[in-house]
From Swiss-Prot:
Annotated PAZ domain residues: 352-462
Positions of region (Disordered): 1-95, 107-147, 963-994
Function: Probably involved in the RNA silencing pathway. May bind to short RNAs such as microRNAs (miRNAs) or short interfering RNAs (siRNAs), and represses the translation of mRNAs which are complementary to them.
UniProt record similarity statement: Belongs to the argonaute family. Ago subfamily.
Name of the protein in its database record: Protein argonaute 1C
Comp. bias (Low complexity): 28-53, 61-92, 963-982
GO molecular function: RNA binding; RNA endonuclease activity
SMART domains: DUF1785, PAZ, Piwi
GO biological process: regulatory ncRNA-mediated gene silencing
Composition skew (Polar residues), residue ranges: 127-140
Gene: AGO1C
Domain named Piwi: residues: 638-959
SUPFAM superfamilies: PAZ domain, Ribonuclease H-like
Regions of compositional bias (Basic residues) in chain numbering: 1-11
Originating species: Oryza sativa subsp. japonica
């Protein structure tokens, strides 16, 4: 290795540096809002520099932000929300003192850093609450108790990938661990404690085999012979093959008694006789069961991977997939349950760096220099990757790549003394190691303090997970590898449990934990499919879906939209004009046959345009169209865009120009759809076009006949909300929050959507309710909830008397944070519209990123599986594997297509509407049949699905960041294009100004443009 530092002797090899590491007006008869106090915003915590003496980052290098700490969730039971003191929420109006805010929740920045010693608060009864006793923390909120189990549906048995875990009868002790000098690597920490146990288990540890979390906590099944003890532990560096003496490192380890983990409380909680889950006891058991897998495999999160747990499959561009398993212990109705699932992720192939680069670029680089774009791509892919040198025989020193040189190797020199003498890298390697560098036109890798390593002397170290964004081909390859038939997945899970041999796990034995090797048998019910209403002019006026599916044959959309003027632009070079004309003609005929008032011909002939001229072509053609329509005082209703199959950023550019600049909705079609052009493709396109121009495809028969409990009896608005985060490695991109809400009642089928940008990886939706100071109007209230409530009133003529809020994307550890902040925002938004206006709220979290899978009890029984071998749509489980006391359920609302279906998990965090289990399960399942884009039931409730689509669409509205090292991040509360035009800016944690999203045109805002 060549160094740029002036020095008297060359440190050609050195140890690895080690760091891993506006409201827009009021609806009629809404009262004037009361002035609201201006909320103060608190800045986010300061950024942290990695520990240890690390070199300054090379030019353009990004600083990695520290993740926010998230408080551990504690399970609770229900609090009465108004005058009731029973376990479920009261149906009477909210107490007056709580109308302004049911909870004074902290701002997101305050929630991100919980107090280390929170005050001990008693649960609050809202009936006796005064303004001085408004709940302010998770300790004062109780989630609703389960209101009994559901009874509707056909009963059946299913199997779940949960394995009963016997609760140990042990006296668990918790000890604090301090290791000096402090290191950030869990691997090093574990090595230190492992050596300590090897040396002192029989003596100082009293024969105990402790379980260690790799950080600050150590647990034992019984007390150690001391309350505090100091140890000196020496570790030797790995043998690098040089034959030289291995470096020693000495650590001071202090172990102090901290507390006892109360397993009795856990037992009471599992039996439903204790309200709060003892999180520490659960954490201990989880750590114990992770000890052995952490030593055997590569741990990431709650999963463990190995190249020997299945076939390694190439993913392309230097990546490969490793198989593994997910493991988590959970409290359930059947007791403790170990959830085991198959898993796979991408690893970097252990290739010579020069071969990795050739795969990454899909090009032979052995005889040519790199372009600037290629160099940037390589730099992003290799930064942080660990390599070992190969030019010194058996000596394999390891380094972590920090960057890439701009100059090729042949131009690189470095000072060798303080007199200014310089030497080239090529000369240095020849003289020092007798190694002739062959590829001198390639850049060098930079490691440590900008020392140089030629690519050809480096090989990537095995076992490094790839945490950056995968491209579409890699995602497809990974999905193909992980996609398993339900029967095969069940078989592999059972094999993995037997392979892990928990009965022989020394840590499980030490702590008395016994794991069953049989999947849990669970009672389930198959909910009936709802009857769907279509237009009276069709041959079939309604239909009953079969196995989650139906079609549009002999049916007309219940409310067909109008498209009087439309045009088509073709960006696909291989699609001839005659083909485009034929496709447009057939699509228009299908839209007419489906019930739409659709003009048979476009107002202008289809235009062929270059894919690199999207904005220019669209705006020019729109101008031509308006020259025709303007004198007639008409507007353009629709754009049909034909795109290449691999269209890169073309799709996003088209959507941005249409929705932000021109104010028209669009329907994109890929080349393969145009050439194939069968009735199914055309019918699906017609479904999407209809809702984009304001129509309805279908509604529930029970909705129009007003037979849906707690929905059709009084005006009800259903919300869906989601936050999408940028991909790993995109440290400067904001998170996008989206909220949609039904705009028709009792049909609950049309949804308007709002979006906003907010702080990077911020999960709380910061723009639900906002107030700001206007120079003319004074204090102004706004936010997404308020605007959607006003929009509902304008559309239906009714004020919502009931709110059902489906919230997607929330992990279990964030339940309290999200409920405290977002329910408070809903309350304030309602109060800002009218004094004493507080509709009853039910707040439900929707989860798909879990690892519970349900399998048919008998895979050979054709009456219990669909065509893909999965459980039937409508299968619901609210027993055994669900929460011991709280209101949750698993629902597989869709028919499988490929692989193993993943049921959605619904967890009720707040319920003032007093839903029964049957009422909420039936409502949720039935709504899944109203998704606008297809004639199938979908896997999650449509409002949550629409929120995800809206958030995904909004990412196209942001200006692309093409810099190599952008540092701009978004901050809290940026008004989005759908929620007004406030241009106020706040500050992000790093002090950078927040960049609002561009404003969406009102003509687009009113319809389901995101479908």
């Amino acid at each position: 290795m060549a160094s740029r530092r002036p020095t008297h002797r060359h440190h050609t090899e050195a140890p690895d540096p080690g760091g891993r590491g506006r409201g827009r007006g009021r609806a009629a008869r809404y009262a004037q809002p009361q002035p609201q106090p201006q909320q103060q915003q608190q800045q986010q915590g300061r950024g942290c520099r990695a520990r240890g003496a690390s070199p300054p980052p090379p030019p353009q290098q990004q600083q990695q932000q520290q993740p926010r700490s998230t408080p551990t969730r504690a399970t609770t039971v229900t609090v009465a929300s108004s005058s009731s003191t029973t376990a479920t929420a009261s149906s009477s109006p909210l107490a007056p003192e709580l109308r302004q805010a049911i909870m004074e929740a902290p701002r997101p920045s305050e929630l991100a850093q919980p107090s280390p010693t929170p005050p001990q608060e008693q649960p609050v009864d809202a009936a006796t609450t005064t303004p001085h006793h408004i709940p302010s923390s998770s300790k004062s909120i109780r989630f609703p108790l389960r209101p009994g189990k559901g009874t509707i549906g056909t009963r059946c048995m299913v199997k779940a990938n949960h394995f009963f875990a016997h609760l140990p009868n042990k006296d668990l002790h918790h000890y604090d661990v301090s290791i000096t000098p402090e290191v950030t690597s869990r691997i090093v920490n574990r090595a230190v404690i492992k050596e300590l146990v090897n040396l002192y288990k029989a003596s100082y540890l009293g024969g105990r085999l402790p379980a260690y979390d790799g950080r600050k906590s150590l647990y034992t099944a019984g007390p150690l012979p001391f309350t505090s003890q100091e140890f000196q532990i020496t570790l030797l560096d790995d043998d690098d093959g040089s034959g030289s003496e291995r470096r020693q490192r000495t650590f001071r380890v202090v172990i102090k008694f901290a507390a006892r983990a109360d397993l009795h409380r856990l037992e009471l909680f599992l039996a439903g006789r204790h309200a709060e889950a003892p999180q520490e006891a659960l954490q201990v058991l989880d750590i114990v069961l992770r000890e052995l897998p952490s030593a055997r495999y590569a741990p990431f999160g709650r999963s463990f991977f190995s190249p020997y747990l299945g076939r390694r499959q190439p993913l392309g561009e230097g990546l490969e997939s490793w198989r593994g398993f997910y493991q988590s212990i959970r409290p359930t109705q059947m007791g403790l349950s170990l959830n085991i699932d198959m898993s796979a992720t991408a690893f970097i192939e252990p290739l010579p760096v020069i071969d990795f680069v050739a795969q990454l670029l899909n090009s032979d680089i052995h005889s040519r220099p790199l372009s600037d774009a290629e160099r940037v791509k390589i730099k992003k892919a290799l930064r942080g990757v660990k390599v070992e040198v190969t030019h010194r025989g058996n000596m394999r020193r390891k380094y972590r790549i920090s960057g890439l040189t701009i100059q090729p190797t042949r131009e690189l020199t470095f000072p060798v003394d303080e007199g200014g003498t310089v030497k080239s890298v090529v000369q240095y390697f020849q003289e020092t190691y007798g190694f002739a560098i062959q590829h001198t036109y390639l850049p060098c890798l930079t490691v440590q303090r900008l020392n140089y390593l030629p690519m050809e002397v480096c090989k990537i170290v095995e076992g490094q997970r790839y945490s950056k964004r995968l491209n579409q081909n890699q995602i497809r390859a990974l999905l193909e590898e992980t996609c398993q038939h339900p029967r095969d997945r069940e078989r592999d899970i059972i094999k993995m449990v037997k392979h892990n041999a928990y009965q022989d796990d020394p840590y499980a034995k030490e702590f008395g934990i016994k794991i069953s090797d049989r999947l849990a048998s669970v009672e389930a019910r198959i909910l009936p499919a709802p009857r769907l209403k279509y237009n009276e002019t069709g041959r079939e006026k309604d239909c009953l879906p079969r196995v989650g599916q139906w079609n549009m044959m002999n049916k007309k959309m219940v409310n067909g939209g109008k498209v009087r003027s439309w045009m088509c632009v073709n960006f696909a070079r291989n699609v001839q004009e005659s083909v485009v004309r034929g496709f447009c003609h057939e699509l228009a005929l299908m839209c007419q046959a489906s019930g739409m008032d659709f003009a048979p011909e476009p107002i202008l002939p289809p235009l062929n345009a270059h894919p690199d001229q999207v904005e220019r072509a669209l705006k020019a053609r729109y101008h031509d169209a308006m020259n025709v329509l303007g004198p007639q005082r008409r507007e353009l209703d629709l754009l049909i865009g034909i795109l290449p199959d691999n269209n890169g950023s073309l799709y996003g550019d088209l959507k941005r120009v249409c929705e932000i600049d021109l104010g028209i909705v669009s329907q994109c079609c890929c080349t393969k759809q145009v050439f194939k052009m069968n009735k199914q493709i055309l019918a699906n396109l017609a479904l999407k076009i209809n809702v984009k121009v304001g129509g309805r495809n279908t509604v529930l028969v029970d909705a129009v006949s007003r037979r849906i409990p707690l929905v059709t009896d009084r005006p009800t608005i259903i919300f869906g909300a989601d936050v999408t985060h940028p991909h790993p490695g995109e440290d400067s991109s904001p998170s996008i929050a989206a909220v949609v809400a039904s705009q028709d009642w009792p049909e609950v089928t049309k949804y308007a959507g709002l979006v906003s940008a907010q702080a990077h990886r911020q999960e709380l939706i910061e723009d639900l309710y906002k107030i700001w100071q206007d120079p003319q109007r004074g204090t102004v209230s706004g936010g997404m909830i308020r605007e959607l409530l006003i929009s509902f009133k304008r559309s239906t003529g009714e004020k919502p008397q009931r709110i059902i809020f489906y919230r997607d994307g929330v992990s279990e550890g964030q339940f309290y944070q999200v409920l405290l902040y977002e329910l408070n925002a809903i309350r304030k938004a309602c109060a800002s519209l009218e004094t004493n206006y507080q509709p009853k709220v039910t707040f439900i979290v929707v989860q798909k990123r879990h690892h519970t899978r349900l399998f048919a009890h008998n895979h050979n029984d054709q009456n219990s599986v669909d065509r893909s071998g999965n459980i039937l749509p409508g299968t619901v489980v609210d027993s055994k594997i669900c929460h011991p006391t709280e209101f949750d359920f698993y629902l597989c609302s869709h028919a499988g297509i490929k692989g193993t279906s993943r049921p959605a998990h619904y967890h009720v965090l707040w319920d003032e509407n007093n839903f029964t289990a049957d009422a909420l399960q039936i409502l949720t399942n039935n709504l899944c049949y109203t998704y606008a884009r297809c004639t199938r039931s979908v896997s999650i409730v449509p409002p949550a699905y629409y929120a995800h689509l809206a958030a995904f669409r909004a990412r196209f509205y942001m200006e692309p960041d093409t810099s190599d090292s952008s540092s701009v991040v978004s901050g809290p509360g940026v008004r989005g294009p759908l929620s007004g035009s406030s241009t106020s800016r706040t500050r992000a944690p790093g002090g950078a100004a927040v960049k609002p999203l561009p404003a969406l045109k009102d003509s687009v805002k009113r319809v389901m443009f995101y479908c």
